[in-house]
């Protein structure tokens, strides 16, 4: 394709072509695979299938729209005619689609767990373990990479490795068989593997998750448009100058992002396509890292349990919301200046929602940072626990009375220094074992090889056992001697310390006595203070108990007082009601009596006037009204008295409570004052001790200062010598570095030469294979020609053979006239048949050569003659007439007699 171009330009053009073709192939393959996820395979196998494509998963319209959007994306580039820019955009599109499908599958697992759909979760989890890794950017090593591996610091994906070791980098990620071009495309199989075990309902849920992730990508792109516009010019130059690792061509698939009109308009117009795809790629990578860290953090919080059930997922969600989500959202709201609004939103809603105006990138970044902080804190705590554990073990071993290692418990019992080593019977045992299976033949003694080897092996074991026992005994003896000397040395050191302490001057002794007496006085005062505190506490407890009892009885008295008041009120009410009822009854009786008196007066004719009766009734009514008024006033007076008593009791209870609180505060203030006094005395004592310690430290510092001045001079001299050594070492290191760099350069040159030689050898091998193929074709042609020649020669030889047979038959007829006289008809018929067959073979050699074995067998029967023909005569005729035909005739006769009837005489059988 690019043979007319120079080598470098042809290589670059071929690389760009492969990049474009690989990316476009994966995009189209993903488009069809995505449509097949919701449709039956027969819709794509048959061009005129009656089953229509489902539009939920794209369908035919979705495939067409996807390809149109892809063309629009390429046209919206700054330089759509530049193949490198187009290849870069297609590669980013493919990577974004890969990460989008991966994020959708991970979110689908969380959705199934949150809904409690355990079978669907198990199916997707088991299938994704096999389906997602081939779709990711995992390394696929070749079977030849073990022989030609990359050096250790280099990464197979780095441009440096691809530039220095292109073939080895290709083998590190080119699949198991990188040279074979007929590797099947497993993209559709891997996508279907992730969703193969789902039902129709669960498959619709999966489709909803895919669409949801797609809409989330559109929201991220719309929310970050200003960032893309701002950094478009800077990133474009960096992306143009960057050389991506094009050796990695994993099977990826297209993005469904631009199906939304807003996102497509964004990609086409205002924002740069490459910047948009780069932003989406970074967001998806951030999301994947967050999901992986969430899974690891959840497993750590749940003590190593996998989150594979609804209960565990609920526990994980609660822990994550409390420890990660809420702090991260609160920090984000604080950064945005909306902390109060966030708190109000948290109070109004039960769930944790992000603050208004926060983008998805900021939300996930905050969660990722919080997860990393939590994991770092956990790691630091684990390290601190381990350090504390080791320190406790170290201190426990150090605090033992005997400074011996813990290996002493595995040692033997204590032995004395004077011991004697027993002489092992090694030689005697060896001789005894050797002579057990020996054969004595007088002056010679023979042994079997296996027996001798076994005896030598046992001898070696005995010798090693003796050496080990000697080592153990001597080491124990030396260790016990050292332990004894150490004990004696420690005793001597203790005696020396006691002597030094006994020789302390009198001033120091007086100071020590004063300090001891002061300490004793302080202890006595502290004990007295504690005793007084205890006595006061005892009194306070008694008073408090009395007050509690009084309060309890006071409450009872108040309750009784209230009940008495209520009973008295009820009695007053009853009395008032009773008086009213009695008055009413009296009034009624009086009215009835007056009425009766009036009636009697009317009947009997009384002489008194009615005015007196009227005055009496008026007076009685006034008296009744006054009595009612006085009774109401008495009831009000009783109520006022009871209310006043109740108020007085409440005020007394309130004042008693204030008095008890004031007493408690006074007691606490007294305790605090006493504690402050004790603390002041203790601080004074501590300051006095610190002053003495400072004086002693000052004297020690003066002595140490003199020593340090002396050591400084010696260290200065040593430092000069060390500087001289360091300079010499630096010179030698520089020389070694120069030698190493030169050696590395030589090694790199050798490696490049070897790679060039390897490429030349591979080219020569290909050329040799081509030459071998050409030679094979030439040999096939020569073989065909030889077969044709042999067929012709065979036909000629068969003609000659027939002629020889005719001559032999004529000779036989001449020599045996009696036989000829006996059967002339049969012989003539045989001769005629042989002549006719010979003539037909001579005229049509190729047709007769392809006949079946039946014709050959007939011909062989005709050729057979009686055995009475003289052998010498036959040999003379054969040797004299046709010597070259003899072997072929015998071979033909033998094959005709021994071959089965189903095998035909073909030229291939004779040519071989």
From Swiss-Prot:
Coiled coil: 1-35, 220-276
Keywords of this entry: Coiled coil
InterPro entries (UniProt xref): CCDC162 (IPR040401)
Stated name of the protein: Coiled-coil domain-containing protein 162
Lineage, opening ranks: Eukaryota, Metazoa, Chordata, Craniata, Vertebrata
């Amino acid at each position: 394709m690019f043979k007319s171009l120079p080598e470098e330009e042809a290589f670059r053009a071929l690389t760009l072509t492969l990049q474009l073709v690989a990316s476009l192939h994966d995009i189209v393959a993903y488009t069809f695979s995505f449509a097949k996820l919701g449709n039956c395979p027969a819709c794509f196998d048959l061009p005129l299938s009656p089953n229509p494509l489902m539009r939920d998963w794209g369908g035919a319209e979705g495939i067409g729209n996807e390809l149109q959007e892809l063309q629009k994306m390429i046209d919206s580039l700054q330089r759509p005619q530049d193949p490198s820019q187009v290849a870069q955009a297609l590669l980013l599109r493919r990577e974004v689609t890969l990460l989008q499908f991966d994020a959708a599958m991970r979110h689908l697992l969380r959705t199934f767990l949150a809904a409690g759909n355990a079978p669907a979760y198990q199916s997707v989890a088991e299938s994704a373990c096999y389906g997602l890794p081939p779709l990711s950017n995992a390394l696929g090593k070749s079977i030849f990479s073990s022989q030609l591996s990359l050096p250790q610091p280099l990464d197979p994906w780095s441009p440096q490795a691809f530039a220095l070791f292109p073939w080895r980098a290709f083998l590190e990620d080119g699949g198991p068989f990188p040279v074979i071009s007929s590797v099947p495309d497993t993209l559709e199989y891997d996508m279907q593997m992730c969703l193969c075990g789902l039902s129709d309902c669960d498959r619709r849920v999966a489709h909803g998750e895919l669409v949801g992730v797609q809409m989330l990508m559109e929201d991220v792109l719309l929310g970050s448009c200003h960032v893309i516009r701002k950094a478009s010019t800077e990133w474009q130059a960096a992306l143009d100058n960057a050389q991506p690792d094009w050796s990695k061509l994993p099977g990826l698939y297209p993005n469904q992002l631009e199906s939304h009109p807003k996102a497509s308009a964004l990609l086409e117009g205002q924002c740069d396509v490459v910047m948009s795809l780069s932003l989406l790629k970074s967001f998806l990578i951030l999301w994947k890292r967050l999901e992986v860290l969430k899974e690891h953090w959840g497993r750590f919080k749940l003590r190593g349990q996998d989150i594979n059930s609804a209960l565990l997922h609920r526990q994980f969600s609660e822990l994550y919301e409390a420890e990660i989500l809420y702090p991260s959202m609160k920090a984000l709201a604080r950064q945005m200046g909306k902390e109060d609004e966030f708190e109000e939103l948290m109070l109004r809603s039960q769930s944790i929602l992000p603050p208004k105006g926060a983008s998805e990138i900021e939300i996930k970044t905050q969660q990722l940072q919080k997860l990393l902080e939590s994991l770092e804190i956990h790691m630091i705590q684990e390290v601190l626990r381990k350090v504390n554990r080791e320190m406790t073990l170290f201190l426990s071993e150090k605090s033992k009375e005997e400074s011996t290692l813990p290996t002493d418990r595995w040692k033997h019992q204590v032995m004395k220094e004077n011991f004697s080593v027993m002489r092992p019977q090694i030689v005697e045992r060896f001789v005894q074992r050797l002579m057990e299976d020996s054969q004595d033949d007088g002056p010679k003694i023979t042994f079997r090889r296996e027996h001798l080897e076994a005896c030598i092996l046992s001898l070696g074991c005995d010798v090693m056992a003796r050496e080990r026992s000697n080592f153990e005994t001597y080491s124990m003896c030396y260790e016990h001697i050292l332990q004894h000397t150490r004990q004696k040395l420690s005793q001597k050191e203790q005696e020396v310390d006691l002597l030094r302490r006994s020789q302390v001057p009198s001033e120091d002794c007086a100071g020590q006595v004063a300090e001891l007496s002061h300490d004793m006085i302080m202890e006595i005062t502290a004990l007295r203070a504690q005793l007084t505190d205890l006595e006061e506490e005892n009194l306070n407890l008694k008073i408090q108990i009395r007050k509690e009892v009084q309060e309890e009885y006071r409450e009872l008295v108040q309750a009784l007082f209230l009940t008495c008041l209520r009973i008295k009120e009820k009695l007053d009410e009853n009395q008032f009601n009773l008086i009213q009822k009695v008055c009413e009854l009296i009034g009624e009786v009086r009215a009835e009596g007056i009425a009766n008196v009036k009636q009697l007066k009317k009947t009997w004719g009384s002489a008194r006037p009615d005015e007196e009766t009227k005055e009496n009734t008026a007076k009685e009514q006034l008296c009744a009204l006054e009595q009612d008024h006085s009774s109401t006033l008495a009831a009000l007076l009783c109520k006022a008295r009871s209310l006043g008593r109740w108020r007085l009791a409440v005020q007394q209870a309130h004042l008693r409570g204030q008095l008890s609180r004031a007493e408690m505060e006074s007691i606490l203030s007294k305790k605090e004052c006493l504690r402050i006094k004790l603390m002041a005395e203790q601080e004074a004592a501590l300051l006095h001790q610190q002053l003495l310690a400072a004086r002693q430290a000052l004297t020690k510092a003066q002595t140490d200062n003199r020593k340090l001045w002396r050591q400084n001079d010696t260290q200065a001299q040593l430092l000069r010598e060390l500087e001289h050594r360091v300079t010499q070492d630096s010179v030698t290191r520089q020389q070694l570095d120069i030698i190493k760099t030169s050696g590395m350069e030589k090694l790199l040159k050798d490696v490049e030469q070897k790679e060039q030689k390897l490429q030349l050898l591979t080219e020569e091998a290909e050329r040799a294979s081509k030459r071998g193929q050409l030679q094979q074709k030439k040999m096939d042609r020569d073989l065909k020609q030889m077969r044709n020649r042999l067929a012709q020669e065979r036909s000629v030889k068969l003609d000659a053979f027939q002629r020889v047979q005719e001559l032999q038959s004529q000779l036989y007829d001449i020599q045996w006239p009696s036989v000829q006289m006996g059967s002339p008809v049969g012989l003539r018929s045989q001769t005629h048949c042989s002549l006719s067959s010979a003539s037909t073979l001579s005229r049509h050699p190729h047709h007769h050569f392809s006949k079946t074995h039946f014709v050959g067998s007939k011909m062989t029967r005709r050729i057979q003659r009686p055995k009475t023909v003289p052998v010498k005569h036959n040999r003379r005729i054969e040797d004299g007439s046709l010597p070259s035909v003899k072997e072929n005739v015998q071979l033909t006769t033998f094959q005709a007699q021994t071959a089965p009837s189903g095998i035909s005489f073909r030229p291939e059988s004779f040519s071989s």
